[in-house]
Swiss-Prot record:
Species per Swiss-Prot/TrEMBL record: Psychrobacter cryohalolentis (strain ATCC BAA-1226 / DSM 17306 / VKM B-2378 / K5)
Cofactor(s) for this UniProt protein: Mg(2+)
Protein name per its UniProtKB record: Nucleoside diphosphate kinase
Keywords: ATP-binding, Cytoplasm, Kinase, Magnesium, Metal-binding, Nucleotide metabolism, Nucleotide-binding, Phosphoprotein, Transferase
PROSITE patterns given in the database record: NDPK_LIKE (PS51374)
An example Gene Ontology biological process: GTP biosynthetic process
Sequence similarity: Belongs to the NDK family.
Annotated residues for binding of ATP: 11, 59, 87, 93, 104, 114
């Protein structure tokens, strides 16, 4: 087992639904530690840059529009197998396919407004974390 970090974004729909505390509770109960967090209002440039790998996909403009529709809570989570653990807690991208008890099954309304984002690999996690946080903003949890 590896101690890892992953990026998590609580998206505008879940922030608007006052689900931050419930989502953080699930992270912590699964053994993930929050080592950085900030509430942000993304603009088109920041959201577009983050999702640049999807720029040619048909859903890109709608995704950027959604991600700029309200504040998001961007966090770095740390723990044993954090990437896989976080993805398991999130559930399938489409909430209709998400397992009962996952974040998306419980808080997402559609495949477009699906409550959370999580890194899908160690490489993505490193890139995504550095996109939103500098090293001084990520605090080691030793206690």
């Amino acid at each position: 087992m590896a101690n890892e970090r992953t990026l998590s974004i609580i998206k505008p729909d879940a922030v608007a639904g006052n689900n931050i505390g419930a989502i953080y509770d699930r992270f912590e109960k699964s053994g993930l530690k929050i080592v950085a967090a900030k509430m942000m209002q993304l603009d088109d440039k920041k959201a577009g840059g983050f999702y640049a790998e999807h720029a040619e996909r048909p859903f890109y403009n709608d995704l950027v529009s959604f991600m700029t529709s309200g504040p998001v809570l961007v966090s770095v989570l740390e723990g044993e197998n954090a990437i896989a653990t976080h993805r398991d807690i999130m559930g399938a991208t489409n909430p209709k396919d998400a397992a009962e008890g996952t974040i998306r099954a419980d808080f997402a309304s559609s495949i477009d407004e699906n409550a959370v984002h999580g890194s899908d690999s160690a490489e993505s996690a490193a890139r995504e974390i550095s996109y939103f946080f500098n090293e001084e903003e990520v605090c080691a949890r030793t206690r």
